[in-house]
Amino acid sequence: MVRKVDKTKLLTVIGIIIFLFGGAVRIFSHLTSSADNYMENFDVIIFSGLIIGWGVSVSYRIVQKNIRICLVISAALMLLWMTLRAIKYNSPADINTYGRYLWYSYYIAMVFLPLMMFFAMLNIGKPENTNNRKYLLIIPAAVLVLLVMTNDFHQLAFVFEPDFHNWNKQYSYGPVYYVIVVWIFILVLSSIVLSINQCRISATRKKLWIPIVIILVAIIYTVWNNLNHGYSGLRIYNVPEVFCFASIALWESLIQIGLVPSNTGYGN
């Protein structure tokens, strides 16, 4: 069992190194003025590989089926997000409507990832088909995504200049955007509260600071990045990368401290 736990920790360290390497690639391309699509594509491949590796890993490690499904869906959503981002940045700059809808599509992952986390937390230690009413939350999630995808018709999520002039730089946020922010905040906060309440082992409870720190670091970096436009005009990590890596790191921390049942080290 010790060897299995060590192997899991080793894979976690490798994942962190891959994430840092992705940031280093972007810094290198910025310093050498080679910020072209080739470097950006290489970055996407790095992060996509990390997501795929994690998704395959949890499909084998997670014992409880309903939690495993939530995590695999989460990995699929992250991969979708990275794929959409790659398509958007490999498209011509003047694609306008096409590029805008690719951007809107990011919110599929942003809305559903916190929901998958909430579902998984509710499922910890519960038999299958318990409290299926929680899945009704898929309805408001789908409505939020639909409102974003149809934003061109009502501009309740993003407000643009007339005729969508310079849409990717000149826009403001509408009420739907703020509803999504609140949606994400409530689901993440609820997931944390559930994790604390469901943590009955004192040793595990003492380690709950780890996932909380991960969430705080992700929030602080995102706010700082948006307010200061990165470091010297460079955003080392974009929102999709931070969001996805924070989700993976959060889940791994919950698995490692023993809150989420897995077949590596759980019950030690």
Regions found by a protein language model. Name each.
Residues 50-52, 113-118, 188, 192, ...:
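Transmembrane alpha-helical segments
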Residues 9-63, 72, 180-198:
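First transmembrane helix
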Residues 60-83, 104, 135-139, 171-229:
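Alpha-helical transmembrane segments of multi-pass integral membrane proteins
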Residues 35-52, 63-150:
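Individual alpha-helical transmembrane segments in multi-pass integral membrane proteins
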Residues 3-17, 124-152, 207-213:
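The cytoplasmic-loop to transmembrane-helix boundary for the fourth helix
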Residues 16-33, 78-88, 149-151, 222:
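Alpha-helical transmembrane segments of multi-pass membrane proteins
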Residues 32-48, 146-194, 226, 231-237:
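Extracellular-loop-to-transmembrane junctions of the mid-late helices
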Residues 2-12, 36, 43, 197-267:
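Interfacial "cap-and-anchor" motif at the non-cytosolic start of specific transmembrane alpha-helices
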